[in-house]
């Protein structure tokens, strides 16, 4: 085995700093802002001080920040991780540091996890949109292969479309966006509209609040609602 215990992490055992490291993937997103408020309030009520850092959805930066938090002798970590594949975080847990994942999980290791119930919520949303008269429902997402939350939301969407809009191809209605490329997003929206018959109106489900805000801005520039 190539596993070597981390002496710094092991030195944390038996010590209480009453500090918890909180690693978020994008502090500017509404979700992370809400998460920080909720986690911070809960920790303070329990007598812990949250040390909050932002990885900017960058795995290398996340790894650096976690090591910095460990140097501060935190008693544990709450992590909204940047990547589904995260051997560094697994090593930290194996070294004895308590780690809880929030919203996004990691492959190949069973961390304590707090997240959304995508597969119970998505069918209700898609069914509601059909009842409202939308002809089809598209799914607009950022790259999802290394992000478990986006990946699960996409899979929940595909399953829901298969059940509620059996005549539609959920894969074909999934659009992967680069949020820095407004022109490409506009092309995706136009492609979706062109796939509808005259008079029909499609709906768009955004993978998260940041994507939703981006789509809304592009729709405004296109003169659409």
Q: Where are the regions a protein language model picked out?
A:
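Acidic, Gly/Pro-rich loop/turn segments at junctions of secondary structure
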Residues: 79-86, 104-110
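Structural motif
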Residues: 23, 78, 203-205
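Active-site-adjacent beta->alpha loops and helix N-cap segments on the catalytic face
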Residues: 84-94
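Generic structural signal for helix capping and beta-alpha/helix-loop junctions
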Residues: 15, 60, 86-87, 109, ...
């Amino acid at each position: 085995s190539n596993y070597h215990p981390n002496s710094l992490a092991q030195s944390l055992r038996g010590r209480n700093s009453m500090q918890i490291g909180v690693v978020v993937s994008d502090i500017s997103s509404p979700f992370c802002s809400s998460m920080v408020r909720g986690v911070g309030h809960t920790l303070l009520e329990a007598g812990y001080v949250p040390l909050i850092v932002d990885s900017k959805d960058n795995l290398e930066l996340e790894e650096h920040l976690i090591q910095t938090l460990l140097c501060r002798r935190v008693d544990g970590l709450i992590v909204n991780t940047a990547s589904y594949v995260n051997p560094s975080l697994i090593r930290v847990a194996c070294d004895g540091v308590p780690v809880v994942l929030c919203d996004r999980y990691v492959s190949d290791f069973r961390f304590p996890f707090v997240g959304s119930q995508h597969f119970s919520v998505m069918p209700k949303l898609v069914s509601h949109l059909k009842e409202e008269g939308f002809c089809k429902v598209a799914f607009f997402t950022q790259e999802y292969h290394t992000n478990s939350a986006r990946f699960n939301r996409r899979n929940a969407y595909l399953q829901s479309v298969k059940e509620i809009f059996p005549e539609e191809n959920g894969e074909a209605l999934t659009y992967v966006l680069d949020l820095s490329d407004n022109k490409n997003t506009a092309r995706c929206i136009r492609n979706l509209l062109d796939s509808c018959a005259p008079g029909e109106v499609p709906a768009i489900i955004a993978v998260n609040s940041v994507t939703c805000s981006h789509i809304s801005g592009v729709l405004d520039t296109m003169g659409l609602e």
